[in-house]
């Protein structure tokens, strides 16, 4: 994200463009089995926020997207190696179709929204997460992981 943004920044500034950073719901919630992935996606949130502050005076907007699981071949391949606890936690956010996420991104850009959390379930979980300072996410994930482990 940093390299691509750096390569295109002059053109984006000239056209008063819009930068879209694709992160993940894992950046917000963290996930069992996704320590490195969640960390890298959380870094994208910080990158997007910093970029927003730097580019706003130049007329450039930034949107960061944090979707749950999206129906792509990558997720089918990953499911073959994911531990039961990871599968159980991932299922909490729902499963979105790529065209729905794309439409949501286009809408967010048109509305100049900074943060996009696609999917009703994920938005509700995000609101609860913020309202409870993450407690509800930890309690829910702990219960889901415990249940997944008891089945195996």
Language-model features, listed with the residues they occupy:
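Active-site helix of classical SDR
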Residues: 5, 40
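Active-site loop immediately N-terminal to the catalytic Tyr-X3-Lys motif
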Residues: 31-35
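Residue(s) in the substrate-gating loop at a strand-loop-helix junction
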Residues: 24
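Conserved catalytic-site region of short-chain dehydrogenase/reductase
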Residues: 11, 27-29
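A transmembrane-helix-recognition feature enriched in membrane-embedded lipid enzymes
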Residues: 112-146
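Alpha-helical segment proximal to the catalytic Tyr-Lys
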Residues: 10, 53-57
